[in-house]
Amino acid sequence: MDHKSPLVSWNVFGFDIVFNLASVLMVVITAILVFILAIVCTRNLKKRPTGKQNFIEWVFDFVRGIIESNMAWKKGGNFHFLAVTLILFIFVANMLGLPFAIVTHDHTLWWKSPTADATVTLTLSTTMILLTHYYGIKMRGTKAYAAGYFKPFWPLAIINVFEEFTSTLTLGLRLYGNIFAGELLLGLLASLFFEQPAWGWIISIPGLIVWQAFSIFVGTIQAYIFVMLSMVYMSHKVADGH
């Protein structure tokens, strides 16, 4: 079944800027959930961690491993909290659309994974790429940073600049494509259950169970890949050899 998106358009200086209210809502919900998770896991910290403290410390150690695989910790440590926040946000965002969807009587879809919207994922990727430029200039200086685009020889400058755009697109669209495809198939299986009650459940229920499990795996891997590539791009900008 086709679903509509709750769109609102604002005219700014003659340009129509369109917002998907469902995506905005889900981004806010994701941010709130990550904030609550961080508060809960960091309350009453102990020298001998247990339970939730063990979990959050494992996340920090795991992300530190990602960073250290790409750059020295002396520089990479500056991005530790950024990377932890990013992986938690994307993981939670990827999971939100899996248990259920909320669709109103007019077939407007309100509850979904925000990362199933290309606008959200491209915004995330653009933000990360811009941050790599910011920290590259901040940590290396404008002259050294700009000179990196002309290495190993100056004709590569055009290719290096073009690579920034392709990196942004691939980083965002990879995440979007995987999450959108997963939720699309879940929707098809769910519609089969409701629209073909005589035999649809025979296919849809086992299919939903298997695909839910696979989608959790894919959502987790995609959060890891996004953060890993973000740190790869960051290391290229802040490393002295760039």
UniProtKB/Swiss-Prot annotation:
What's in the GO CC field? plasma membrane; proton-transporting ATP synthase complex
User: Which is an annotated Pfam family here?
Assistant: ATP-synt_A
Q: Tell where it localizes.
A: Cell membrane
Q: Which InterPro entries match?
A: ATP_syn_F0_a_bact/chloroplast (IPR045082), ATP_synth_F0_asu (IPR000568), ATP_synth_F0_asu_AS (IPR023011), F0_ATP_A_sf (IPR035908)
Repressor in keyword set: no
Kindly give the PROSITE patterns that the UniProt entry links to this protein. Answer: ATPASE_A (PS00449)
The answer to keyword Transmembrane applying to this record is: yes
Q: Which GO terms describe its biological process?
A: proton motive force-driven plasma membrane ATP synthesis
The family database entries (NCBIfam families) matched by this protein are listed as:
ATP_synt_6_or_A, PRK05815.1-4
The cross-references to HAMAP family, in alphabetical order and at most eight, read: ATP_synth_a_bact
Task: Provide the function of this protein.
Answer: Key component of the proton channel; it plays a direct role in the translocation of protons across the membrane.
Q: Which PANTHER family match?
A: ATP SYNTHASE SUBUNIT A, CHLOROPLASTIC
Protein name per the record: ATP synthase subunit a
For this protein's source organism, the top of the classification is: Bacteria, Bacillati, Bacillota, Bacilli, Bacillales
Q: Which gene encodes it?
A: atpB
